[in-house]
């Protein structure tokens, strides 16, 4: 399985101040982890559930 490049991006909460639980793929740790999304901007390495993260980046 070839990893999608967005799976290598760091967690990006963005500039807004909400605290929305989300998951990102931690490339160094090789697993999906929780972070808090601010609600705007950010990047493609953000998923609403750990299952979606695993499906996209773990395979």
From Swiss-Prot:
GO molecular function: potassium channel regulator activity; serine-type endopeptidase inhibitor activity; toxin activity
Gene Ontology CC, one term: extracellular region
BPTI/Kunitz inhibitor domain boundaries: 7-57
Pfam families (UniProt xref): Kunitz_BPTI
UniProtKB keywords: Copper, Disulfide bond, Ion channel impairing toxin, Potassium channel impairing toxin, Protease inhibitor, Secreted, Serine protease inhibitor, Toxin, Voltage-gated potassium channel impairing toxin
Primary location group: secreted
Disulfide pairings: 7-57, 16-40, 32-53
InterPro entries assigned: Kunitz_BPTI, Kunitz_BPTI_sf, Prtase_inh_Kunz-CS, TFPI/VKTCI-like
CDD domains xrefs: Kunitz_dendrotoxin (cd22595)
Highest taxon listed in the record's lineage: Eukaryota
Expression (tissue specificity): Expressed by the venom gland.
UniProt-annotated location(s): Secreted
Site (Reactive bond for trypsin): 17-18
Family: Belongs to the venom Kunitz-type family.
Functional note: Serine protease inhibitor that inhibits trypsin. May also inhibit voltage-gated potassium channels (Kv). Binds transition metal ions such as copper and cobalt.
Annotated PANTHER family: KUNITZ-TYPE PROTEASE INHIBITOR-RELATED (PTHR10083)
Identification of the protein by name: Kunitz-type serine protease inhibitor dendrotoxin E
Lineage, opening ranks: Eukaryota, Metazoa, Chordata, Craniata, Vertebrata
């Amino acid at each position: 399985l070839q990893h999608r490049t967005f799976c290598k991006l760091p967690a990006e909460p963005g500039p807004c101040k909400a605290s929305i639980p989300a998951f990102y793929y931690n490339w160094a740790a090789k697993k999906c982890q929780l972070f808090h999304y601010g609600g705007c901007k950010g990047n493609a390495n953000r998923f609403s559930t750990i299952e979606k993260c695993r499906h996209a980046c773990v395979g």
